Amino acid sequence: MAYIYGDTMKIDTTGASEATAKQDKLTIKGVEAPKKLAEHDLARGEKYKNMITKVGKAKKMDPAVIAAMISRESRAGAVLKNGWEPAGNGFGLMQVDKRSHTPVGAWDSEQHVTQATEILIGFIKEIKVNFPKWTQEQCFKGGIAAYNKGVSRVTSYENIDVKTTGLDYSSDVVARAQWFRSKGY
């Protein structure tokens, strides 16, 4: 299957920060931490695998990235109450922010995952316009960072995660995606 937004396995990553790793009381950081975090979410996320794969195929988006974002955003649904995060702004497995978008579908539905994937694709395209000299993989990672904090906060590739949650959002998601790929996503 051709994923038109870039090759996840070619995206550089520094992994997760110590703060992100501490979510699961991990004492490791870097590239190993996201693998452990994703592993902890795998059993919960397996029930969504067919849906993730279907949406990925339809949108030409790597399903491993969708799975990784579900892991990072909601821990495969574990942190949600009635589909919402504790502050009440993010909805669903992929945490569509109601302040910027009108969430559609049930929190764990194909409609929701499709909407969130389309939002990610829009960010990747905006990053490509803003940084026309970036490689496709750099734009992919930039789009992931923008999904977390907005396009205007992505100002350079070197500082791609400086304004993201945990100061590691795109690197963490990429490392989780690379791990999910090894699990058949």
UniProtKB/Swiss-Prot annotation:
SUPFAM superfamilies attached to this UniProt entry: Lysozyme-like
GO-annotated cellular components: extracellular region
Active site: 73
Record's catalysed reaction(s): Hydrolysis of (1->4)-beta-linkages between N-acetylmuramic acid and N-acetyl-D-glucosamine residues in a peptidoglycan and between N-acetyl-D-glucosamine residues in chitodextrins
EC number of the protein: 3.2.1.17
Annotated keywords: Antimicrobial, Bacteriolytic enzyme, Glycosidase, Hydrolase
Transmembrane segments: none
Gene3D superfamilies named in the record: 1.10.530.10
InterPro entries (UniProt xref): Glyco_hydro_23, Lysozyme-like_dom_sf
Enzyme class: hydrolase
GO BP of this protein: defense response to Gram-positive bacterium; killing of cells of another organism; peptidoglycan catabolic process
CDD domains in the record: GEWL
Molecular function GO terms recorded: lysozyme activity
Superkingdom of the source species: Eukaryota
Protein family (similarity comment): Belongs to the glycosyl hydrolase 23 family.
Protein name from the UniProt record: Lysozyme g
Organism of this sequence: Cyprinus carpio (Common carp)
